[in-house]
Structure formats: structure tokens, C-alpha cells
């Protein structure tokens, strides 16, 4: 849809409208050769308490000499903690990066507002680690702190990636937490929850 509406590739659109204005110089679907030594190794569990490097292609996450032909709206970006913070901070500031307007405030409210009916909420609640949350139009939203069993504020929002990239914005406390691992299927793990509780305590 983005490519049809804009007339350019999805990655180019993100660079022009989001990454560039936010100064996210290390974010994209393709990792240039000169930056590859900075890339963290991805791991997977092979036995309890043991890891090995993950070498498969999944969700468009791959490192090759050629740009990925499929630029997904849900996976495949490479980034850094600093760049991710710029994105999260823009959302926390209602769509602004300093004096630069990236998204309209109404758009940010739409992204971070509740969007599930009762049937879909029942299905969403079965995801591991997301008790006490709902899903908005972009990410998870905390609705019941006691049910979630975590510290935080009702209305906080964020998401986690398949390799354990986790972020949360708390608009009440004005806190952003970014936690990055490189392990497949890490998601909203117990470790992530413990770290969040430490930071928010």
C-alpha cells in the first residue's frame, strides 16, 4: 500500500519520511559492508542453558551482499539502540523530534490507542507475557498492571521483536525502556519482565 501510494520502495519511503528526519543513520533493510563488523551475532537455544549462532533466514532477517528484495512492514529492519531510541522518543513526544514534526499527534494517538474487540482480545491475551495488555493499531498497550504482574502505567505502549528487541514508552512517567538481545524467539521473556520491573521501580 505504501509503495503504491508513494510510488517508491518501502525502505526508501521510511528513509525519506522517518529515518532521515530522525537521524537514524544505522537503520534500514540492508547492512552496508563497512558496517558489518558492528552487527551482533544472533543466537538460538540448542539445549537448556546452551546457545549456538543462528544461521537461517527468517522473516526477511538475513545478511547478504545484496539488498533484500522483500522489504516487510513487520520484520527485517536492522538498527541500533540509539536509533531505536530516536524513534521511541519521537512517539513519546507526540510525533515530534525537537522542533521537527514527524507524525501528527492524532496519528500517534491512533497508533497507541486500543483497537481490539472482545473476541480478538481473547486471542491476543493468549500470547505469552501479554496478560493485562491489549493491542492497539501499532503495538501492545498496558491496561491492567496487576494482571500483567509488572510495574508501569495504564496506557504505556511498546513492542518486541522476534530476536528480543523490546521497547516500552510510559507517557505518564515519561520513561522509555529499550532492551536488546539477539536470540530468536526471545520476545516478552521473564528476563525482559524482570528488567522492566527493575527500571520502573
Where are the predicted features?
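Generic C-terminus detector
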Residues: 182-201
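Short, well-ordered beta-strand micro-motif
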Residues: 140-141, 168-170
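Short, well-ordered beta-strand elements
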Residues: 166-168, 174-183
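Short, surface-exposed loop or secondary-structure junction motifs
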Residues: 1-151
Amino acid at each position: 500500500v505504501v509503495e503504491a501510494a508513494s510510488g517508491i520502495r518501502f525502505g526508501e519511503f521510511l528513509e525519506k519520511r522517518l529515518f532521515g528526519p530522525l537521524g537514524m543513520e544505522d537503520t534500514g533493510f540492508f547492512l552496508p559492508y563497512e558496517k558489518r563488523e558492528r552487527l551482533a551475532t544472533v543466537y538460538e537455544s540448542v539445549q537448556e542453558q546452551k546457545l549456538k549462532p543462528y544461521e537461517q533466514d527468517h522473516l526477511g532477517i538475513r545478511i547478504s551482499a545484496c539488498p533484500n528484495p522483500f522489504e516487510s512492514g513487520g520484520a527485517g529492519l536492522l538498527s541500533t539502540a540509539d536509533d531505536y531510541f530516536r524513534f521511541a522518543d519521537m512517539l513519546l513526544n507526540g510525533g515530534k523530534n525537537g522542533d521537527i514534526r514527524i507524525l501528527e499527534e492524532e496519528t500517534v494517538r491512533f497508533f497507541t490507542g486500543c483497537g481490539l474487540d472482545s473476541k480478538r482480545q481473547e486471542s491476543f491475551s493468549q500470547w505469552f507475557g501479554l496478560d493485562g495488555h491489549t493491542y492497539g493499531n501499532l503495538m501492545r498497550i498496558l491496561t491492567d498492571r496487576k494482571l500483567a504482574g509488572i510495574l508501569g502505567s495504564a496506557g504505556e505502549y511498546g513492542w518486541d521483536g522476534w530476536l528480543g528487541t523490546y521497547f516500552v514508552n510510559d507517557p505518564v512517567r515519561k520513561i522509555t525502556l529499550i532492551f536488546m538481545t539477539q536470540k530468536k524467539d526471545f520476545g516478552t521473556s521473564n528476563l525482559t519482565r524482570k528488567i522492566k520491573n527493575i527500571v520502573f521501580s
